[in-house]
């Protein structure tokens, strides 16, 4: 399973319907769970991004979910692949 950090900004459409954002998140979470992805956390934020989500699941399922989220037109996203300490140790252990 891979960790993904999703940085999201509302589109104009999403901003106009911002009051529905918590319900849209619940729908996203249900869709994610149906695809085998766990939503570890969500935060509505100030600054450069409107939301930050952390998910965990298979790479292909995560990408498909991101495309589905984008196709709804409420947010634009940037997704980062995250590595935990054990994964990082394995990778740097190969630097011989």
Q: Where are the regions that the model predicts?
A:
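A compositional/biophysical signature of low hydrophobicity enriched in polar/charged and small residues
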Residues: 1-96
């Amino acid at each position: 399973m891979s960790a993904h950090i999703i940085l999201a900004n509302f589109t104009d459409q999403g901003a106009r319907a911002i009051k529905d954002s918590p319900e849209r998140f619940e729908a996203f979470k249900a869709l994610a769970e149906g695809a085998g992805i766990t939503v570890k956390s969500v935060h509505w934020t100030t600054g450069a991004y409107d939301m930050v989500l952390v998910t965990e699941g298979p790479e292909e399922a995560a990408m498909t979910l991101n495309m589905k989220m984008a196709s709804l037109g409420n947010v634009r996203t940037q997704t980062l692949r995250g590595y935990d300490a054990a994964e990082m140790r394995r990778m740097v252990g190969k630097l011989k």
